[in-house]
Regions:
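ATP-dependent adenylation/nucleotidyltransferase module used to activate substrates
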Residues: 1-102, 143, 158, 176-186, ...
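Alpha-helix N-cap and loop-to-helix initiation/capping positions
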Residues: 2, 30, 34, 126-129, ...
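Proline- and acidic/polar-enriched loop/turn elements at helix boundaries
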Residues: 19, 62, 111-113, 153
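Charged, low-complexity surface patches
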Residues: 39, 89, 130, 169-170
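Mid-to-C-terminal catalytic subdomains of enzymes
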Residues: 87-93, 97-141, 148-149
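Peripheral terminal appendages
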Residues: 132-190
Length: 191
């Protein structure tokens, strides 16, 4: 929905290509290079579509900051010949947000939303029902006033990650939040 909205704002065509990354066992069992394997599958599908439509290049949104942290997916970007114009021109995440806001892009202030598979430890099987459970819990916490939240699973332990400045409010609300999260199937919770 968000991509469709932004494409409409930009006057671009929006096309959804379906890829089930979890059909591939090497991705489903969450190896350290999962992002690489996943990006390779996604860009492979996109590249085939681009060739069919005679599109000469594919662009993606890596920025300068992304080049200085662990991003195994960048290897696939390079291998597949996908261009990263923001990074190529040295735009940082903050500069991208500022420019997007100046241009009136509706999602300029939207917090980043990394893949839900990052919420599971390497080697854990990624199952759709687990990802859905995590997504529901994070959505619940966002509705309760925690706009930046990650819920990471470590076996039976769910670790809630929020900015430190929200700890106090979370602790004040724990009598409401914790039972609700436990009812969603999270046995043990940490902050």
């Amino acid at each position: 929905e968000i991509a469709q909205k932004v494409a409409k704002e930009a006057g671009a065509i929006h096309k959804v290509l379906f890829v089930n990354e979890l059909e591939q066992a090497e991705i489903r069992f969450n190896p350290k290079d999962r992002c690489y394997l996943c990006k390779k599958a996604l860009f492979g599908k996109l590249k085939a579509y681009a060739e069919e439509k005679r599109v000469s290049c594919i662009l993606e949104g890596t920025n300068e900051d992304d080049l200085h942290v662990y991003r195994p997916g960048l290897k696939a970007v390079k291998e597949m010949g996908v261009l990263s114009p923001l990074a190529m021109h040295g735009f940082t995440k903050e500069e991208v947000r500022r420019l997007a806001e100046e241009l009136g892009v509706s999602v300029a202030k939207r917090p980043s939303t990394p893949c839900l598979a990052t919420r599971l430890p390497y080697g854990a099987e990624i199952r759709p029902e687990i990802l859905e459970k995590i997504a529901k819990a994070e959505e619940y916490l966002k509705k309760e006033g925690f706009p930046v939240v990650r819920l990471r699973l470590h076996g039976e332990i769910a670790r809630v990650e929020i900015p430190k400045e929200h700890f106090g409010r979370f602790l004040k609300m724990q009598e409401t939040l914790v039972p609700k999260l436990k009812a969603m199937g999270f046995r043990y919770l940490t902050l």
